[in-house]
A protein has these predicted regions:
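C-terminal catalytic region of ATP-dependent kinase domains
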Residues: 4, 41-42
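Short acidic, glycine/proline-enriched loop segments that cap or flank alpha-helices
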Residues: 68-76, 95-99
Length: 121
């Protein structure tokens, strides 16, 4: 999250998530080496650590704006949304050689649906 531009104050968590999906996509598309290293890592340990770090930063951002409650459940969900997004983009990179608009729409759908289900519980 520190690599991304500062997001404006969002009306709700969905809006913030969409802003950050677009920000991550733009970062990956303009930094191909970082995209490849992040989406095609050499070990699962590195994948998990990056997802956890990004998810924790995302959770802090969402909570700081009072968009999500401060719970371990929501923290873990933010970590999972980071991993889910990377899984979908990894498929795009492997199949298409880039991050396509169709896969980015799928990332947005998946992260919103997952976090929505966690927050509804």
């Amino acid at each position: 999250v520190a690599e991304l531009p500062q997001a404006p104050r969002a009306a709700d968590w969905r809006e913030m998530m969409l802003l950050y999906v677009d920000g991550v996509r733009d970062f990956y598309l303009s930094n191909r080496v970082e995209m490849i290293l992040a989406l095609l890592p050499v070990s699962l340990l590195s994948v998990n650590q990056v997802s956890r770090d990004f998810g924790q930063s995302l959770f802090q951002l969402l909570h700081a704006q009072d968009l999500v409650p401060k719970t371990q459940k929501v923290l873990r969900a933010c970590e999972m949304t980071s991993e889910l997004a990377d899984l979908v983009w990894r498929k795009s990179l492997i199949e298409k050689g880039t991050l396509t608009p169709a896969y980015t729409r799928e990332v947005k759908r998946v992260v919103i649906a997952y976090l929505e289900s966690v927050l509804a519980d």
